[in-house]
Design a protein with these regions (language model features):
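Conserved segment of winged-helix/HTH DNA-binding domains
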Residues: 102-122
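Generic structural signal for conserved hydrophobic packing positions in ordered secondary structure
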Residues: 45, 77-80, 115
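N-terminal helix-turn-helix DNA-binding core of bacterial DNA-binding proteins
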Residues: 29-75, 99-106
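N-terminal leader segment of winged-helix/HTH proteins
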Residues: 1-44
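Alpha-helical residues within the helix-turn-helix
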Residues: 68, 79, 85-86
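Beta-hairpin "wing" of winged helix-turn-helix
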Residues: 85-95
């Protein structure tokens, strides 16, 4: 049996469950927070950035190493790292002439881990 992903089940009635609507409305985050959350998830919408995050999930790495790992130019990697840094997902530190990147904190690792768990569910 295959699921039809293009059809949505709908109610056959027009009953409003006001108690549930009000309960959810009271807990709903502010519009600005939801907008910021949507912007965060947009950053995860690029496979190159996901590959970079995966690499940094495993180890702190410099731009040169990430470029070799992903078979991309340093310029392309730097561009994506800039986007990730603006989204506060990665941080960097400079050691002499080498700039190392890593995930900002465990929250980023958890988002990544939860995403992988979700897509691997059967």
């Amino acid at each position: 049996m295959t699921k039809k992903f293009n059809s949505i089940e709908r109610c056959d009635c027009n009953v409003i469950h006001e108690d549930i609507v009000n309960q959810v409305r009271d807990k709903m985050p502010q519009e600005e927070s939801l907008y910021d959350l949507a912007e965060l998830f947009k950053v995860f919408g690029d496979s190159t950035r996901i590959r970079i995050l995966w690499a940094l999930h495993e180890a702190e790495m410099c731009v040169c190493d990430i470029a070799v790992l992903l078979n991309m130019t340093q310029s392309a990697i730097s561009h994506q790292l800039r986007v990730l840094k603006q989204a506060n997902l990665v941080k960097n530190r400079k050691e002499s002439k080498v700039v190392y990147y890593s995930l900002v904190d465990d929250h980023v690792r958890e988002i990544f881990d939860q995403g992988l768990i979700h897509i691997n569910e059967k």
